[in-house]
Amino acid sequence: MTGIPPPSRFPEQPIPPWRRAVLKVGSSLLAADGGGLSPRFALDLAHFVSANITAGRQLVIVSSGAVAAGRALIPPLPESGGALAARQALAALGQAQLIALWQRFFDRPVAQVLLTHDDLRNRRRYLNARATLRELLHLGTLPVVNENDTVSVDELKLGDNDNLAAIVAALIDAQALFIATDIDGLYTTDPRHHSDAQPLHEVRTLTPENLAMAGDSSSTVGTGGMRTKLEAALKAGAAGIDTYLFNGRSSDVVRGLAQHRLRGTRIHPTCTPIAARKYWLRHAPVEPGAILIDAGAAAALAQQGASLLPGGVLSAEGDFRRGDMIQIATRSPDHPSHPLARGLVQYSAADVRRIAGCHSRDIQTLLGYTYGDTIVHRDDLVLL
C-alpha cells in the first residue's frame, strides 16, 4: 500500500461565484482518535464558513458525528441483534455534543435540524423543511443538519449524509455543494492502493466508470465512501448544483476555499439550476383543480415575474392540498378561464377560498395561522 499523493497533485482552480451552499462534513474529520469529537479539523472548516457568511453568503452544514460522539459517552456496547437500536441510542446521546462542537466556533446561533426520509418524500413535510431552513438562513443563523438516526428505520433511512447533503442543497436552491473528506479528491483509481492513480481535478460528466472505480468507505467511524460522494454529486448535478470534493484535513486546501480557490475535484452539474427546477415545475403531475386570478395578477406574473398574492385571486377550483402542483388560470367576464401558469401552492383550496382577494397581512387573522405572504411563490412557479 502506498500513501495518498499530496494535495499539490491537484492543480488550483477558481470556484465560480455562489450565494448559497451546503458544506458536508464527515465523521472521519470530527471523530477523535480516542473516541468522541475533536475540533482539530473542524476549526479550519468553521473559518471557511465564517468568511463566507461575513461576505454575505449563506451556508448550511450537514454534519455527521453524532454516533461517534455518543460512543464516547458510554461503555462499549456488546455486539447484538439490536444494532439499529444501539445506533439510535448513540445518536441520541451524541447529537447534543455534535451541536455544541459547532456552536463553540461561531458567535451566531447554531440551529439543529434533524431530517428523515419521510420528511423529504411527503409534500407537506418537504415544504415545511424548506421553509424552516430558508427562515433560519434569513434570520442569520447557521443550520446544522443531520439525519434523525434516533427515529429512522432501515427501510426509511436516507443512507448517508453525502446523499442527505445533496438533497438539502436542492432543498435550499444552493449553487454549490462542498464535500469535505479525508482524501484529496477523485482519482482514476484508489490512491491508497495504487501508486499510479491520477487525480481528476474536473469531471464534466459522471459516468458508470467513475462510480465503478470509486472505492468504498475505509473509515471506521463513517458510513459513506467515495462512491456515495459521487452518487451525491449526481443528485446535486441533476438540480444544477456544482459539487466540490476536497481534503478537509489540509489547512492549506481549506484556507484556499475561503479565497474561492479549489485544490480537489469539481464535478459539474448536468444542467443549470434554473433549467432543472423549471423543467421539474413544468412536467411534474398536476393535481385536479386550479386557482383563478384577475387580470392584474396575471400581468404581475407574466410581465414582472412576481409571486401570486391573495389579493389577485378570484377563487379556487377543486380540493387540492398545501404543497400540491396546481394550475393558475385567468378568468374575466368576457372570456373563459385560460391556463397561465402552474406551481406549488402554499395553501389548501379551502384556505385559498377564505383568503381570496384579501391583503397578505390579513391571512393570519382570517385563518388563525399563516404559511407566508404568497399563495404560490415565484420560485415555485412556471409560466405555460
Swiss-Prot record:
The UniProt record lists the keyword Cytoplasm: yes
Binding site for ATP: 24, 181-182, 223-229
UniProt keyword annotations, A-Z: Amino-acid biosynthesis, ATP-binding, Cytoplasm, Kinase, Nucleotide-binding, Proline biosynthesis, Transferase
Major place of residence: cytoplasm
Pfam families: AA_kinase, PUA
CDD domains assigned: AAK_G5K_ProB, PUA_G5K
Positions of the PUA domain: 288-370
Pathway(s) of this molecule: Amino-acid biosynthesis; L-proline biosynthesis; L-glutamate 5-semialdehyde from L-glutamate: step 1/2
Record SMART domains: PUA
ATP-binding as UniProt keyword: yes
Gene3D superfamilies: Acetylglutamate kinase-like, PUA domain
Catalytic activity: L-glutamate + ATP = L-glutamyl 5-phosphate + ADP
Role, per record: Catalyzes the transfer of a phosphate group to glutamate to form L-glutamate 5-phosphate.
Record's protein name: Glutamate 5-kinase
Species of provenance: Xylella fastidiosa (strain Temecula1 / ATCC 700964)
